[in-house]
Amino acid sequence: MDNKNSDVEDFHREHDWLFSLVTDPEGKRFSVPKTGAQRQRDMHEAMARTADFLAFADNPEAQFPAVHVTGTSGKGSVSMMVGAMLQGMGLRTGLHTSPYLQMPTEKLMVNGCAVSLAGFAKLVRQFRDVHASWGAADGVYNRLRYTEAWTAITFMWLAQQNLDFAVVEAGMGGRLDPTNLMPSELAIITNVAFDHVKSLGPELTDIARHKAGIIKQNKPAITAVTQPELFAILEQEAAEKEAKLYALNRDFSYEVHDAHTITVDAPFGRYERVKVGPVGRYQLGNAAIAIAALDVLVGHQKLAGPINTAALANFSCPGRMEQVSRKPLILLDGAHNPHKMRALVESLKDAFPEKKITAITGSIVNKEVADILQVLVPAVDRIIATAPNVPGKPAVDPAIIQETVAQLSTIPVSTAPDVRTAVDEAMGLAGPDELILVTGSLYLVGEARELWYPVKE
C-alpha cells in the first residue's frame, strides 16, 4: 500500500472514531428533543466536562494568544479576514472555523493551509491517548462528546503549532460554548439575531447574553451590535469584567465607496479605500469590523502594526457568495438563518439586479425554515427544494419546503431527492443568462461544492 492510500485509511479510521462520540456508549444519539432547561443544563455540563479534560491535558487552550469571534452572522467570515490580515503581516496564524464544508481538516488551518490527512490522524491518536488516560483516572467525567472533543483537539493542535496568533470561531452562542474556555486577547461579537433559538433563546436579549459571555476580564472587545437593548447587555458584561468595549458608530465606523471598497475609521487609526475581494456587499461590514479589531490589538499593544489590509483584496470565502460556474452563473451561499438570508438577498439585488434566479434550497431540522423562506422566496423566480445529507442530523422534508413556498408565492417550485439531482434539474431549466443559487444550509452548500471541487482530487 502506498503512503497516500495509507494516509487516507488512517484519516478515515481516526475520523470514524471521533464521529463515534456523537452517540453515547450504548449507541444512542445525544441529539434528542429537549426542553430549553435541558439544553441549558447540557451546555453547562459540556463546559464542565471539557474544562476537566483540558486541565488533565495541561491546558493547551492557554498556550497561544488568541482572538475569539462570535455572532449570529459573519463570525466565520470575520475570523477568516482577521486570519488573512494577520498572516499578511508575516505572523504564523492558526484558524479554527466551524462547521466545515467538505473536509474536517478545514477546521484546522495554519497560514491558509489545512492540516494534512496524516497530521489529522496523528492528532486524533494523540487525543485518544490522553482521553483514555483521563477516562481511566477515576474522576467525575470519563468521556467527552463530539463537539467537546473537537474543541479539545483544536486546542491541542493550536498549542503545537508555535503560533503568533490563533483566531477561533465559537461554535454556538459564546458563554457556554466550549471554545470559551480559551483565554483571548480580544473578543469580537459581530451581531445578534435569531438563530439556535431553542438553545440560546427564546428572546434576542437571551442570545445577546450568550454572545457577551466571550468578553474576558481586562481584555478589549469589539462589536457591530447597535440595537440599544442588546448593546446594553454587552456593555454591562464589559463593565463587570473591566473590559474596554469598542462599538460600531461610537468608537469606529466605515464608509462604503462601491461594492469592493471601504474606508474604516477605527479606534486608533484610519484605513483609506481598502479593497475587499470578490465577495458579496454584505462582507464589507465584516471587513470593517475585522480591520477595526486588528486596530484595537495594535492600540492595546498586543500586535505590532501596520495592519496589512491589502490581504483583503483577494479575499474569498468558500460557501459565501462563491461562484463555481459562469455559464450558467452558479453561486453557493450557506445562509442558514433569516439574518444571513436578508444579507444575501440584498447582495444579490445589488450585484445581479436583472437576473432571473433559480434557488436550490434545503435545511436540517431545527432551523427557522419558514422564516428563511419568507426572505428568500420574494427574491427568486423558481425554487427546487432538496435535503442535505448529514449523518445524525435529520433534514427537513423537501415536500414541506415545497408546501411552504406555495403558501408564500406562485413561483414554480419542485423537489429533488439530493443536491446533485437538484443542480442537474436547475441547469436544465435555467437559461444561459440566468443565475442558479444553492443556499439555506452550509451542509447543502458543502455537498454542492463537491460537484465542482471533489474531495478525492
Predicted regions, residues:
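ATP-dependent carboxylate-amine ligase catalytic core
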Residues: 7, 28-47, 52-55, 59-63, ...
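Hydrophobic anchor at the beta1->P-loop junction of P-loop NTPases
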Residues: 67-71
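Hydrophobic positions on the alpha1 helix immediately C-terminal to the Walker A/P-loop
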Residues: 77-81
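Beta-strand->loop->alpha-helix junctions that form or flank phosphate-binding loops
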Residues: 96-99, 224-225, 237-256, 276-281, ...
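Acidic, Mg2+-coordinating active-site environments of NTP-dependent enzymes
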Residues: 134-138, 161-169, 184-273, 287-306
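Nucleotide phosphate-binding/pyrophosphate-handling subdomain across enzymes
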Residues: 165-170, 177-180, 184-188, 192-196, ...
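C-terminal helical cap/extension that packs against the catalytic core
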Residues: 227-242, 329-330, 338, 373-435
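Active-site-proximal loop/hinge segments that shape catalytic or ion-binding/gating pockets
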Residues: 441
